[in-house]
Regions:
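Conserved ATP-binding module of the ATP-grasp superfamily
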Residues: 124-126, 147-150, 167-202, 235-237, ...
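A conserved helix-loop-beta module that forms one wall/lid of the active-site cleft
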Residues: 94-160, 182-185
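Short beta-strand-to-turn element immediately C-terminal to the catalytic PLP-Schiff-base lysine
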Residues: 131, 161-166, 211-213
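Short, well-ordered beta-strand elements within core beta-sheets of diverse protein domains
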Residues: 162, 199, 241, 300, ...
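Peripheral (often C-terminal) accessory segments that flank ATP-dependent C-N-forming ligase machineries
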Residues: 25, 120, 137, 312-418
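ATP-dependent carboxylate/phosphate-activation module, predominantly the ATP-grasp catalytic core
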Residues: 168, 198-265, 269, 276, ...
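ATP-binding N-terminal substructure of ATP-dependent carboxylate-amine bond-forming enzymes
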Residues: 1-104, 135, 366-372, 378-379, ...
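Short, flexible turn/loop "capping" segments at secondary-structure junctions
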Residues: 152-155, 232-233, 376-381
Length: 418
């Protein structure tokens, strides 16, 4: 199984799970990438380096060339990394291996093309327009109206996304987003740095994780997102299963399935983000891959569905074997802790365990002594992600509240004072 783009080090657990399932992994990534260590750790059988420039056609050819030189003919190709979905789709297609069509994956990868195709297909679509300059942003505002959202065409984790409420705010917001949306800030923007302005969506947001097989949805898990930290839309957390109005959630799931089917994303594990708005269900974005962070652990804990195994089987054209629990087996709360202020991180006083929980994972993203940005900088630094599983949602929430009762401590200080 060729894995194209191993992603950040937190993705190591996905590769370990694939190895546990018996997959012989060959990782293809940029020279010097951390994933080379997966071979010495016994997780992967081989690793190949291939240059990445951000153009999907060029990057796919580089992968094909590396495989040809190594004399490797894979049985399947996959990725769990957003940056690499278009490359993986092209490599699979070139080798005649299972996967979604490159044009369908491209339409999901580009938030602008997602809106254009969705509107063309007659699906309910927020107003949106491409933006390459401040003048174009003003022109787009005349079409989209306010409130609106400025976001990058290519991105993840709400990076560079910000709400705008009036014309006077446009120059400052444009300047702020432009500083973020660059390859120097994050490699994901090697794919392009165009922006879009789109209609703001009210309501409650959800993550919808789908398992598709031959165009049919076999399984859908819904996680309910908590209100984001506007104006930046940084995520604050979620819980699973969802507790929102069931009929509204069902309508959103139906729209998610209809959207991926209409796009031509007929197989594998997909991650769709949407909202139940005052005007009905709306799609925020479509990801032609499994959800990131701890989503696959959450889905397995709650519904007894292994999304990694489902994706592996799909990429090998093996029949699906998922048997979801009829009722939630447990409940999960995932909390993202941001820096409360700008300065030097003095303490992260989390408890390292919680009584009576099924599972607890704390992923630290910052260390004591680091300079951190608070909400005054719009995009606050993520300090930690806490995932707690308990017998029910009420218990999971209570245990999480106890765990996080002492907030992070930040003291005044400049980045040079470490």
């Amino acid at each position: 199984m060729v894995v194209i783009g191993a992603g950040y080090e937190g993705k190591r657990r996905a590769h370990i799970r694939m190895a546990e399932l018996g997959a012989r992994l060959l990782i293809v990534d940029e020279p010097g990438h951390w994933s080379e260590s997966l071979v010495s750790d016994g997780v992967a059988v081989a690793w190949l380096g291939a240059p990445v420039v951000g153009d999907a056609d060029q990057d796919a050819q580089a992968v094909l060339d590396a495989l040809a030189v190594a004399g490797i003919r894979p049985d399947g190709v996959l990725t769990f990394w957003e940056d690499s979905v278009c490359v993986a789709a092209r490599v699979a297609a070139a080798l005649g291996l299972p996967g979604n069509p490159p044009e369908a994956v491209d339409a999901a990868r580009s938030k602008i093309r997602t809106r254009e195709l969705s509107a063309h297909l007659g699906l309910p679509t927020p107003r949106a327009q491409r933006v390459r300059s401040l003048d174009e942003l003003f022109a787009a505002a005349a079409y989209v109206g306010f409130p609106a959202v400025v976001k990058p065409e290519f991105g993840a984790s709400a990076m560079g996304c910000i709400r705008v409420d009036d014309l006077e705010s446009l120059p400052g917001i444009y300047s702020l987003v432009r500083r973020i949306v660059s390859p120097e800030h994050n490699a994901i923007f090697r794919a392009g740095n165009d922006l879009l302005l789109e209609e703001y969506l009210d309501g409650v947001e959800f993550d919808v994780d789908l398992v598709m097989h031959e165009g049919e949805c076999l399984f859908a898990s819904v996680s309910e997102n908590w209100p984001t930290a506007e104006p930046s839309f940084q995520e604050t957390g979620l819980h699973c299963p969802a507790t929102h109005d069931r009929k509204a959630v069902r309508r959103l799931v139906d729209l998610c399935v209809q959207t991926v089917q209409s796009f031509g994303l007929w197989s594998g594990v997909l991650h769709v983000e949407g909202k139940c708005t005052s005007h009905g269900p709306r799609i925020i974005e479509v990801n032609a891959r499994m959800g990131g962070a701890r989503i696959h652990e959450i889905v397995e804990a709650v519904w007894n569905v292994d999304l990694i195994e489902a994706q592996l089987r799909s990429c090998l054209a093996l029949p699906p074997t998922i048997k979801p629990s009829r009722r939630p087996r447990s409940a999960a709360v995932n909390t993202i802790v941001h820096a409360p202020a700008t300065g030097r991180l003095a303490a992260l006083p989390f408890a390292d365990r919680a009584a009576d929980c099924v599972d607890l994972t704390i992923d630290l993203e910052a260390e004591v002594g680091d300079h951190v940005d608070g909400p005054d900088q719009v995009f606050a630094t993520v300090l930690a992600e806490v995932t707690l599983v308990a017998k029910n949602l009420r218990r999971a929430r209570a245990l999480t509240a106890d765990l996080l009762c002492n907030p992070p401590q930040v003291v005044p200080g400049s980045p040079l004072e470490r």
